[in-house]
């Protein structure tokens, strides 16, 4: 959750993180890679609310096997 300008999360499902990012940044994020929707797939990390959603996705994609692209106002995770 967002506290003092930071998004801190520990072992939360990737899909929950994406849901939080969608709400925080008011953007549409579509997960096309069905393996990433598995609730057992968890992520941990801390981000500043000053970071763009693109920066956050870039960092997460370094530790999880996915690629993403932005089309108009929609982020697509492949």
Placement of each model-derived feature along the sequence:
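A residue-level detector for the "anchor" residue at the start of short, highly conserved motifs
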Residues: 1-78
